[in-house]
């Protein structure tokens, strides 16, 4: 609920303070309402800098790694080749600008989401008898006696909260301010309408897609130590394969690659907006970004994950600070509630 409210606020302000530059292009995002709403250009510059770093980290390398891992696990495509293909496809899309980016997302994401939900429901239908036990394990792990006792309880709880929040933000991006950038170019709309769409996106991503994924993994891996030894996209693909065979594994793998690809091209746009605000690296940014996409599929990402968490936190700090001071300007018309 906090994430949904935050998504509404940042998107509302992003659309409210947006403006067109001399090329007729919408300029929008936290760096705009930090300048025009708060009058603090330094805060805007800090936000844009960390957004640029995130675009080269979690927005490109992490997503490319996930896609390459899926391609290698499902079809045996080497990671180097998989990340190279992803970089080429990304380059083809970004050469078309924001309109092509929007068109790609418009066609790819609904199809991939529909396939993912359909196959997830099929798996859960086949594992219906295990669903109650899956929920029981979730609540036992969260609130069990073992989890609140012992000398390291405080550390364990704080670590769980830390990773829960960081991965939740990684998933739905509520609080980072990126929704304000992505919704800003929408034509023939209002801040309220885009804010409501942003709220729905957070709900759909976290409550629907992430919950379905968790249930599928819990229901299909009971007692399966071999599958549990896998991680990331390979674990998800193996879980669907266990119940739906090769067809299920292929369709889910395609969906996960599409999700990763769509996220990559969205983060290219986010990084582009950030560097234009900073007036830095604009000429070499496409090369830097595509290089990061290629590298992401070829290297281990422990350090990238750690740095991405740090950069996410700094982005959220500046954005949430701006939201706090601009809360009074956010309106919630009754007709949208």
What does each model-identified segment do?
Residues 32, 36, 40-47, 83, ...:
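Membrane-interface alpha-helices at helix entry/exit sites of multi-pass transporters
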Residues 1-24, 205-210, 309-322:
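Extracellular loop-to-transmembrane helix junctions
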Residues 14-20, 51, 93, 168-191, ...:
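Helix-loop junctions at the membrane interface of multi-pass solute transporters
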Residues 10-17, 121-137, 145, 149-152, ...:
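Extracellular/periplasmic helix-exit of transmembrane alpha-helices
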Residues 1, 11, 15-55, 73-76, ...:
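Transmembrane-helix boundary/entry motifs in multi-pass membrane transporters
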Residues 66-71, 77-139, 272-279, 305-328:
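Membrane-interface loop-to-helix entry segments
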Residues 44-51, 73-98, 114-115, 252-257, ...:
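Transmembrane alpha-helical segments of multi-pass small-molecule transport proteins
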Residues 2-10, 84-98, 109-129, 162, ...:
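Selective recognition of specific alpha-helical transmembrane segments in multi-pass small-molecule
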